[in-house]
Regions:
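Hydrophobic beta-strand-centered segment that forms part of the acyl-chain substrate-binding groove
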Residues: 65-116
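Hydrophobic residues in beta-strands and at strand termini
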Residues: 36-40, 92, 140
Length: 175
């Protein structure tokens, strides 16, 4: 018994944790987005967020979202996988200022088991105005050999999480 006073065994704790995380993954559409308060140093001379910071914000949001799905980057890297960026786009709709709190929503636009494409939507948390959109394209490589991986074969659990999340998001988009 791990916590004797509470009557929890290690097996019960593991089962509850697994069930909770499985529910989180199945509720991927309940992810409320990554909240970000811009920092003063991210502004330019005009008092708006410098364009180079948006790509960093995309990465922060992507890392946060993957953690929510219970596949944080450190677990992916521990599994011997790296996910290099192949391409990035960013379309600026409205300026973001230092005092604006933003919400970044992340979705999987495309997934093949070897490649992955994310889309990003940045909203003003107060007004709900869409401020920026973007995408990033990635592939999965073996950390040691830098060879392309097919997750379905090499890491079926990680593949399942990405595949199921992609399918759920696709269904929601088509509704």
């Amino acid at each position: 018994v791990l916590f004797p006073s509470e009557g929890f065994s290690l097996a019960t704790l593991i089962t509850k944790t697994y069930t909770k995380r499985k529910q989180q993954r199945s509720d991927c559409m309940n992810y409320t987005g990554y909240l970000r308060q811009p920092h003063y140093y991210e502004t330019d001379q005009m008092g708006i967020i410098h364009h180079s910071n948006y790509i960093r914000w995309f990465e922060e949001a992507r890392v946060d979202w993957l953690t929510f799905l219970d596949v944080p980057y450190y677990k992916i890297e521990e599994a011997g996988i790296i996910i290099p960026v192949l391409a990035v786009t960013c379309d600026y709709k409205e300026m973001i200022r230092y005092e604006d709190q933003v919400r970044i929503e992340v979705t999987i636009d495309h997934y093949t088991g070897t490649r992955l494409e994310f889309s990003y939507h940045i909203y003003n948390q107060t007004t709900e105005n869409l401020l920026t959109t973007g995408t990033s394209k990635h592939c999965f490589l073996d950390k040691e050999t830098n060879r392309l991986l097919q997750l379905r074969r090499s890491h079926p659990e990680i593949h399942r999480i990405f595949s199921e999340t992609f399918e759920r998001q696709k269904e929601t988009t088509n509704d």
